Amino acid sequence: MMRKTLAAFTAVLLILIPINCFAASNGAMNLKTGQTTTQSGAYYNDGVLYLELEPVCRYLSYTVTLADAGSDIRLTNGSDTIKIDPAGNQIVKNGHTLNVSYLSPEDTLGGGCMRLNDRLYMRSDLLSQLLGLDVQTDETQKTVTVRGIIQNVLNIETKRNDLSEGLLTATVQYPVLSGPWSAQALETMNGIFKQTADSAVDQGRKNSKDLEDIVAIQKASGNEYGGSMQCSVYFDYDIKYSQNGLFSVVLSNYQYAGGAHGSTIQTSYTFDLKTGKQLALSDFMKKDSGYQKFLNTKVRNEIDSRVKEKKLFENTPFQTLGNNPDFYLSDDGITFYFQQYEYFPYAAGIQEFPVSFESISQMLNPSYSCLSQKLNRTA
């Protein structure tokens, strides 16, 4: 049930991949990394962009280890270790297990990978997430240019907890941060992550207790309970931005309480690593720039576009993001999102609406002009 739900969410989110990723449905392109150009180092497969692993990893000083065609793939750079298990369709980065089960229909090997002419490729979106890449496509030159993103000096440990208590099973993963930043700031952030994860488990335990009570009542009345006898929790995190002393993360809390389907609550936090302050949208924008009207129009127009293309059905008309909307930072912009049922049906999942930094560069608070400048890129 959980995997099916997450797959549905991800299918919706794939709509949001930058348009240049869908410029070609199939075909090879050149890959430029630094001063090196690799012929056919990039490839579109059914509209999804793949990058050849070896030249990208070499450019970023990662070592690629692959014993044979059917074995795990390991990417290593110092203490940074990424294990890709194509057969198991699993990726683990420094102890953090990423959910990529939804990728299997599109990949020839699984785990976001495909093999072409004895060369190993990986999905650009996944590889960017794992290694921190800035990927630009030039259709005219038939070239994909990859640069590394210079990220915050920050150690990220994954705290994992697997539970099995009565009717409840739970898998919980959340980040623990350390590094050359304010100890108080890091303590504040880590406390929030732990508290949010603990609350998810508490919610799962309550769901389990409620289900046990329902089953007991049914039995006492001489009836058998016909529903699922299981509750589950899947709590995970996704780091969206870690540059310029800013840290933006999304926490996902999936709960299944024995009904027809589960539900997911997505929570995002954006922090200033120097102070530990949680930043709101208003912190990033000039007060009198008209940003609220501009952003409301951008989101409204995108909703209309998706509805027109029959990719989305709107239950409740969207009017405004409000004064304190849910958002997170990404490498390219600010992404706004809505919870399940907030405006759209359950099947639509959590809809996300990215707005590029370029489009709001004149509205940004000068203190955060770095967001639109993209200065922190490797040569």
Annotated model-derived regions:
Residues 2-25:
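Sec-dependent N-terminal signal peptides of Gram-positive bacterial secreted proteins and lipoproteins
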Residues 7, 12-13, 36-37, 84, ...:
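Hydrophobic alpha-helical segments and their boundary regions
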Residues 24-27, 32-50, 55-72, 97-379:
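Compositionally biased intrinsically disordered regions enriched in Thr/Gly
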Residues 72-78:
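Ser/Thr-rich, low-complexity intrinsically disordered terminal regions
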Residues 78-108:
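Signal peptide-directed extracytoplasmic domains
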